[in-house]
From Swiss-Prot:
It is found in: Mitochondrion matrix. Its main location: mitochondrion. Belongs to the PDK/BCKDK protein kinase family. The gene is Pdk2. Gene3D superfamilies: Alpha-ketoacid/pyruvate dehydrogenase kinase, N-terminal domain, Histidine kinase-like ATPase, C-terminal domain. Keywords: ATP-binding, Kinase, Mitochondrion, Nucleotide-binding, Phosphoprotein, Transferase, Transit peptide. Signal peptide: none annotated. It comes from the Eukaryota. The lineage of its organism: Eukaryota, Metazoa, Chordata, Craniata, Vertebrata. Homodimer, and heterodimer with PDK1. Interacts with the pyruvate dehydrogenase complex subunit DLAT, and is part of the multimeric pyruvate dehydrogenase complex that contains multiple copies of pyruvate dehydrogenase (E1), dihydrolipoamide acetyltransferase (DLAT, E2) and lipoamide dehydrogenase (DLD, E3). This is [Pyruvate dehydrogenase (acetyl-transferring)] kinase isozyme 2, mitochondrial. ATP binds at residues 251-258, 290, 309-310, 325-330.
Amino acid sequence: MRWFRALLKNASLAGAPKYIEHFSKFSPSPLSMKQFLDFGSSNACEKTSFTFLRQELPVRLANIMKEINLLPDRVLSTPSVQLVQSWYVQSLLDIMEFLDKDPEDHRTLSQFTDALVTIRNRHNDVVPTMAQGVLEYKDTYGDDPVSNQNIQYFLDRFYLSRISIRMLINQHTLIFDGSTNPAHPKHIGSIDPNCSVSDVVKDAYDMAKLLCDKYYMASPDLEIQEVNATNATQPIHMVYVPSHLYHMLFELFKNAMRATVESHESSLTLPPIKIMVALGEEDLSIKMSDRGGGVPLRKIERLFSYMYSTAPTPQPGTGGTPLAGFGYGLPISRLYAKYFQGDLQLFSMEGFGTDAVIYLKALSTDSVERLPVYNKSAWRHYQTIQEAGDWCVPSTEPKNTSTYRVS
């Protein structure tokens, strides 16, 4: 019996390329925050969600799986990247099991929800596993500018795709699992229709402060100010995913606290971290200002690179600082902001400090998923060969101008 099951599994895996080729021909269908809310309202229909997801999830999976295969062979050959590929193939095959199932069958709907939970759990370690694959590549082959450029382009799209897939899965499983989260009874899935921005700021600060106090025995205070240009008498609320906002803020607080404490280690007091939350007609902006010494301009873009980290990668059991890691915190935080058409930018003054600004859409109708699509434009990006720059490169040695003197 065991050999028969193995035979069936191998037959399924053999069919994976056919499914990838088919579903990658379709473009993903981005949803707005308002559509997510409508989808999960009191009259939400599990059958409708099932019918949508069994088509949409394969499209999103297949699109990004086509791009994985465009990575340099040296990256694809690393054990960690191969493991991630196997997870994606298995998840696609899991959903294919429901392609012809009857949505009127309650058992089918229950099995589909269980399958989504399995897929979500399978992909829990995708980020650190892919990060390990990049490290394996760097350790073996060193730095290659062309490959680095392609890896940066791919990982931005890959992780953004992952965020979107988990969003779809979380909405379905949280809404249709038959229970309500007692801690957040008014949430629609993972979305808070009335999210208090300052409350999320405080939660993220408290957790980062806990880590900072534990490691450094000190931490900067927090000052929060709100400016509501649409209604000056009301606190600022928005429709958003609190866990996404928390992720961004927690990462920024960790960086700000680490920089502040380390740059003022000889001082008796630490300058506070200041938060400004501003709501306008189009944007909701959150600015975090620290006095952590800042970063040189030439290093700003590096902070968003997956190939660069300001701290050594922590090894299990070594007691490394909890405020550092793979160096993926900022790049992925920016992707969370971009996912619903926002952004995360850094403005630094070396010798003084850094302002980090999170830009989000104020209206739920404007908060639309930003999704990668596999097409000729994406394919061409991976085929691009880095050419010589069209700007002069300053010499590292000062030029001897005496050779140009007229005798």
